[in-house]
Amino acid sequence: VCRSNVFDLHGEWDLAYLDPPYGSANVKMPSSRVRYAAYYHLWKSVVLNDQPTLFGAAGRREDSRDGISASVFEDFHMGTSGRLKAIEAIERLVQQVKARYILLSYNSSGGRVTREEIQQMLSENGTLMDVMAVDYAHHNMANMFRTRKWCCADRGHQEYLFLLRKE
């Protein structure tokens, strides 16, 4: 386990497990509404063992605000390649991580990057050895009053695991 900016890691590993944030695939909801930093603020406080300034009814860390803690992995804008910035970031990470194998976890209904886009990108960066899909129940945002309907409610909810051998 490493506690630093993932793009600044300098180690070498046999296996790297990557579970990047994926924001929201719900086009009815601004992507900034679903940020990992907002959901994982408690864990960050435990790891840092600090006394952060809090805000809001939930008592979140000040540094988990949408405008402060945006993640490139959650960016739904188009990048210079004509692809989503999120897939560009995942590809950059895959290319930079010094590991013989990468196990990448991604969600079928959480992000705007598709399974096919990830498979294509991984195939261009090594040998895609296996893809697993694990079924999960939808989370409580499926019942949000504001949107009335989760964008992917008609599909199953799966967590994908991609095993890549880098060459």
Give residue spans per PLM region.
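Class I S-adenosyl-L-methionine-dependent methyltransferase catalytic core
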Residues: 1-167
